[in-house]
């Protein structure tokens, strides 16, 4: 009987710590949910879990550790992005806390589902292997499909969930197919090993522009581009954003994007630096189209949720600039942008949540009329968010855009920087319209509509506003933290 | 923070951020309208008082920046927080701190959301002071864009009937022009960063104006690249000034703005454009400024004539004065691009003069509008007999604006035309500008005559009463200054002399560009 030994794989808890802890914690919250219906307990538990997960990242911050046969990595970039995602998740839970029961969606599964999704994102951000990237993408997507349809008695929510599921399924297909093609050509799934393999190609004179390899890279990027709603893979965004429960929309618009962009960054910069001129050119065009399309179409929207959906497409374009710059400056600028965008967009959705009545799925711009009179503080917060989205100083939106354009210009993507500022002007038009509506137009409604600025939501909004001003005035705090971000290239 | 003045404290930062402190205090005075007004007036007067030591401790013989203070703000990007002041910005800073209390005092009748109104004016003051003092391009841009926000709300919430159209136009027009400056700033900062790193020098001053002035010729930029960079700055400033043909936001914004907003807009906000042209377009790109002096002067002259003709055609008094601003600001651009000592001195002095006289005109129009609720010139007439004190002040401000010798406007315009005549811009453009002076007399006297003489109609201009003591007290300091500048202009030109001489020498000695280099 002695010849049967069970060999435990070497588990590096530092590397896996953040996603694993959050996953386990989410299961705990799920179990607790069976015994209590007190939402406050669930919220508190979830926030504690997020906090501990963030602390796990702080323990070894600064060191670079690779684990699980180099499939996962624990590095500064990963931890930093994870922190932003965790902060975004915490804000999401705060702003959802009173909204869900108000909409008759009091199922406690909401909290563990969000934590599951976040855990998948953390995993994705730390992935350095095509297989782990796939696992990460699927973990977060499956939780998100459920969350999108969480308000399923409402027709639009169900429609959004089906749409997201079907198209997401297609995207997953592309992802797997792309991985298969890349593996077929290089015999590797590890990002760094793919790069090594390609450099051997180069040294032996084998052409890099092999159509099958290029198709593989393209398919993976289509799948990730779908997740970040990059033009022309954005078409699902407005419908899903409109139909999903607003906190879920808020969450998807920042966290999913952040995680998928982080994966894209690693995929392009670690595995395919050899093809940089090709993807910089192609994705440069996509980035330009994304910025232009998102901002121009947003001008025509009168529904606020759809407007923010198109605006989030546009912001994906700006973040793409940081990815494309493919430099230390670009990576650092990307993280700052992600932080600024997370705070701002969650804040803006929080204000919508505070105004959303039960059974009122469509949210028109004109509903904001006279908000400056009705609840000036909420309107003031929304003003800060809108100025930040438009990139007006002294908000975080400006500081982060400055960093992105600087990185793009430095990487000789000057035409993208110019398109970026021009589209920023277009975006100012519709963000300003929100401000005009709130402060300068009076409501026609005879009876005042109620606002639901509850304690937890207000806390979320206040945190967002303070964060935006802090990053806007003292971006150095965060740029210092995000300095010298080098993507790990393990053997 | 490193401080280089003899006062022992960072006076410039104090002056810039005091108004913001006032605005925060005002936020806690909700519901106490009267107290808030008195507080805002007192606080802005305090800011003015605090800014006076700058004038008294200003060293006339020093050409460089004074009261210099800085700390490393975003070292990773090469951005520093840097404030400093020289002969060009000295009077503009004082003009800002001087005009703001008067604007606040003129807004005594704002009944709706008074606290917000006063807070916005104080925030506006902070932004404008920051623009005149910032010596780092990034910091400058932050203040520059920030000035849009309070004015946007001032016009949009307390303005006239078409206020939303006017304020959105104002914001988008200036924002659109400014983002190209952002690209220019990013490009210059990156070039400087690389150059400094290459030379083994500390890179934390990459966006500093002084370092850029010293290094810009070492970047190896081609003629075209320099011109594009120049344009990215120039367009932003041209819109702000506003220079023909990008002036169209101004009449709308001026007409719809509340009186205090118009005063700040005319007196200080437009000057940011002129200041920016001197500080950035001329100082950073002296060769391009020389090369393009004539085309820019042509735009300025067209603006002078065009503004004057349109001003004459207006039936709305406020619009008339707004177009007169287009005409007058053309003179300032003409003076700047004369690129010699006399022209630049005249331009800076004229910025102050225009601030005082047009500010006074907008105040007067606001005062009479509050009583009659009409701005149609045709409705007015015969106010000589009814409200003589008002008419005395109107006559004084009109004459100053026309450029009557003995008052401030004459000195500025005279210096500008002398400078332009003596420069490559030449006598033809100067002659056309001189026509603008004559036209100014035509349209401003038409306005004065229409208001003061002729038959008085009780029906069309009802409830007229003469200026109150408060209103006289607002106008008096402005008028006294107009007279003082007119009689003792040397006191005002003296502090800027050294700076402007140095600037003239700098431009004259700028290495000529070799084509295709």
UniProtKB/Swiss-Prot annotation, chain A:
The keyword Nucleotidyltransferase belongs to this UniProt entry's keyword annotation: no
Leader peptide range in chain numbering: none
Enzyme class: translocase
Pfam families reported for this sequence: Proton_antipo_M
Localization, UniProt: Cell membrane
Alphabetized GO MF terms: NADH dehydrogenase (ubiquinone) activity; NADH:ubiquinone reductase (non-electrogenic) activity; quinone binding
Membrane topology reported for the UniProt record: Multi-pass membrane protein
Transmembrane segments: 15-35, 41-61, 77-97, 105-125, 130-150, 165-185, 211-231, 247-269, 279-299, 307-327, 333-353, 378-398, 416-436, 459-479
Coiled-coil stretches noted in the UniProt entry, renumbered to this chain: none
Statement: the UniProt record of this protein carries the keyword Nucleotide-binding: no
Entry GO CC: plasma membrane
Function per UniProt: NDH-1 shuttles electrons from NADH, via FMN and iron-sulfur (Fe-S) centers, to quinones in the respiratory chain. The immediate electron acceptor for the enzyme in this species is believed to be ubiquinone. Couples the redox reaction to proton translocation (for every two electrons transferred, four hydrogen ions are translocated across the cytoplasmic membrane), and thus conserves the redox energy in a proton gradient.
Matching NCBIfam families: NDH_I_N
Family label: Belongs to the complex I subunit 2 family.
Protein name: NADH-quinone oxidoreductase subunit N 1
Organism: Herpetosiphon aurantiacus (strain ATCC 23779 / DSM 785 / 114-95)
């Amino acid at each position: 009987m002695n010849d049967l030994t069970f060999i435990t794989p070497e588990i590096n808890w530092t590397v896996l710590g953040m996603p694993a802890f959050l996953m386990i914690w989410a299961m705990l919250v799920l179990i607790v949910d069976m015994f209590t219906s007190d939402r406050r307990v669930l919220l508190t538990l979830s926030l504690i879990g997020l906090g501990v997960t963030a602390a796990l990242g702080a323990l070894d911050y600064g060191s670079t550790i690779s684990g699980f046969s180099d499939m996962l990595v624990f590095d500064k970039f990963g931890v930093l992005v994870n922190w932003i995602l965790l902060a975004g998740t915490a804000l999401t839970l705060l702003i959802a806390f009173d909204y869900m029961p108000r909409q008759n969606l009091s199922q406690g599964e909401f909290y563990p589902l969000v934590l599951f999704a976040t855990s998948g994102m953390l995993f994705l951000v730390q992935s350095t292997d095509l297989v782990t990237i796939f696992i990460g993408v699927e973990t977060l997507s499956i939780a998100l499909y459920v969350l999108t349809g969480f308000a399923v008695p409402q027709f639009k929510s169900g429609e959004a969930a089906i749409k997201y599921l079907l198209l997401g399924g297609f995207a997953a297909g592309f992802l797997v197919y792309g991985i298969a093609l890349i593996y077929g050509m290089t015999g590797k799934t590890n990002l760094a090993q793919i790069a090594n393999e390609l450099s051997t190609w180069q040294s032996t004179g084998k052409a890099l522009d092999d159509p099958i390899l290029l198709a593989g890279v393209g398919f993976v990027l289509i799948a990730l581009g779908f997740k970040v709603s990059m033009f022309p893979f954005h078409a699902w965004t407005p419908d899903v954003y409109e139909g999903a429960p607003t906190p879920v929309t808020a969450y998807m618009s920042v966290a999913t994007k952040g995680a998928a962009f982080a994966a894209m960054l690693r995929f392009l910069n670690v595995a395919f630096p050899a093809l940089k001129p090709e993807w910089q050119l192609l994705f440069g065009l996509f980035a330009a189209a994304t910025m232009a399309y998102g901002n121009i179409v947003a001008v025509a929207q009168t529904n606020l949720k759809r407007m923010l959906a198109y605006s989030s497409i546009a912001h994906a374009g700006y973040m793409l600039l940081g990815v494309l710059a493919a430099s230390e400056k670009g990576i650092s600028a990307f993280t700052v942008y992600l932080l600024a965008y997370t705070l701002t967009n969650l804040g803006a959705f929080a204000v919508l949540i505070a105004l959303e009545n039960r059974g009122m799925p469509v949210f028109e711009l004109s509903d904001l009329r006279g908000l400056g009179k009705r609840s000036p503080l909420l309107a003031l917060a929304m003003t800060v968010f809108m100025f930040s989205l438009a990139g007006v100083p002294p908000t975080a939106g400006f500081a982060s855009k400055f960093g992105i354009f600087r990185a793009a210009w430095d990487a000789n993507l000057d035409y993208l920087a110019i398109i970026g500022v021009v589209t920023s002007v277009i975006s100012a038009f519709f963000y300003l319209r929100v401000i005009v509506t709130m402060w300068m137009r009076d409501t026609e409604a005879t009876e005042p509509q109620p606002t639901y600025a509850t304690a937890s939501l207000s806390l979320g909004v206040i945190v967002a506003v303070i964060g935006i001003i802090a990053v806007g005035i003292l971006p150095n705090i965060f740029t210092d933290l995000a300095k010298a971000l080098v993507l790990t290239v393990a053997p | 923070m490193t401080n280089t003045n003899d006062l022992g404290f960072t006076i410039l930062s104090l002056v810039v951020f005091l108004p913001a402190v006032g605005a925060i205090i005002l936020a806690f005075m909700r519901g106490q309208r009267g107290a808030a007004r008195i507080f805002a007036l007192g606080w802005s007067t305090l800011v003015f008082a605090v800014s006076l030591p700058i004038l008294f401790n200003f060293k006339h013989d020093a050409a460089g920046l004074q009261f210099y203070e800085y700390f490393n703000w975003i070292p990773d990007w090469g951005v520093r927080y840097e404030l400093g002041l020289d002969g060009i910005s000295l009077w503009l800073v004082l003009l800002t701190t001087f005009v703001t209390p008067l604007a606040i005092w003129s807004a005594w009748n704002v009944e709706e959301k008074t606290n917000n109104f006063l807070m916005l004016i104080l925030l506006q003051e902070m932004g404008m002071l920051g623009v005149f003092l910032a010596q780092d391009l990034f910091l400058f841009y932050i203040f520059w864009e920030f000035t849009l926000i309070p004015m946007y709300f001032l016009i949009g919430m307390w303005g006239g009937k078409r206020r939303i159209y006017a304020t959105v136009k104002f914001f988008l027009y200036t924002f659109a022009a400014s983002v190209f400056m952002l690209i220019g700033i990013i490009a210059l900062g990156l070039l400087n960063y690389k150059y400094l790193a290459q030379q083994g020098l500390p890179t934390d001053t990459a966006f500093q104006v002084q370092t850029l002035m010293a290094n810009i010729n070492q970047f190896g930029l081609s003629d075209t690249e320099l011109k594009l960079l120049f344009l990215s700055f120039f367009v932003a400033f041209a819109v702000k000034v506003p220079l023909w043909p990008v002036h169209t936001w101004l009449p709308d914004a001026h007409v719809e703005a509340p009186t205090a907003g118009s005063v700040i807009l005319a007196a200080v906000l437009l000057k940011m454009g002129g200041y920016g042209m001197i500080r950035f377009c001329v100082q950073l790109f002296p060769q391009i400024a020389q090369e393009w002096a004539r085309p820019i002067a042509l735009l300025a002259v067209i603006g002078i004539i065009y503004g004057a003709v349109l001003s004459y055609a207006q039936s709305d008094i406020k619009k008339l004065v707004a177009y007169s601003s287009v005409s007058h600001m053309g003179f300032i651009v003409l003076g700047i691009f004369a690129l010699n000592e006399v022209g630049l001195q005249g331009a800076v002095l004229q910025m102050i003069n225009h601030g005082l006289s047009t500010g006074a005109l907008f105040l007067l129009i606001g005062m009479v509008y509050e009583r009659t609720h009409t701005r149609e010139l045709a409705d007015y007439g015969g106010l000589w007999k009814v409200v003589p004190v008002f008419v005395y002040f109107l006559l004084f401000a009109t004459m100053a604006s026309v450029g009557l010798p003995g008052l401030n406007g004459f000195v500025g315009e005279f210096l500008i035309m002398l400078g332009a005549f003596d420069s490559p811009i030449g006598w033809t453009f100067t002659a056309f500008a001189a026509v603008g002076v004559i036209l100014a007399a035509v349209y401003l006297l038409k306005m004065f005559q229409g208001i003061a003489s002729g038959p008085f109609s009780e029906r069309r201009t009802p409830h007229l009463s003469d200026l109150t003591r408060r209103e006289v007290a607002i106008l008096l300091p402005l008028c006294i200054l107009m007279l003082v500048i007119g009689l003792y202009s040397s006191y005002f030109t003296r502090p800027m002399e050294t700076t402007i001489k140095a600037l003239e020498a700098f431009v004259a000695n700028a290495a000529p560009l070799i084509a295709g280099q």
